[in-house]
């Protein structure tokens, strides 16, 4: 494992590109493999916190989960990845997609929510 530690909850592998204005929420862990591209304005959210309900006066659901982006993956601009998601090896995620569950390797996926559209093998 050759990843360079930047923060204790963030590992970025070799030969990666991270575009401008990306946001990495590090309440959970983010593990980015080798040769991964994360285009500008991507958001990786390791937690969800709906806050408090003004009507019910109580805290709403909060969840924390890790994100893993495997080797060779490509995330287009303005992609949002939510907690507990794994993106497979050599997978392409189209611009402006909302990735709310795992995406397998060697596919192209996009949309809101993100869905597999094509096999890249």
Where are these regions (language model features)?
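Flexible, glycine/small-residue-enriched loop-and-beta-strand segment within the central core
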Residues: 1-12, 17-86, 112-113, 119-121
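Residues that flank catalytic or metal-binding motifs in active/ligand-binding sites
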Residues: 40, 95, 105
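Catalytic-loop signature of eukaryotic-like protein kinases
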Residues: 72, 90, 107
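Beta-rich strand-turn-strand
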Residues: 77-92, 97-101
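Acidic, glycine-centered active-site loop in nucleotide-sugar glycosyltransferases
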Residues: 104-105, 110-113
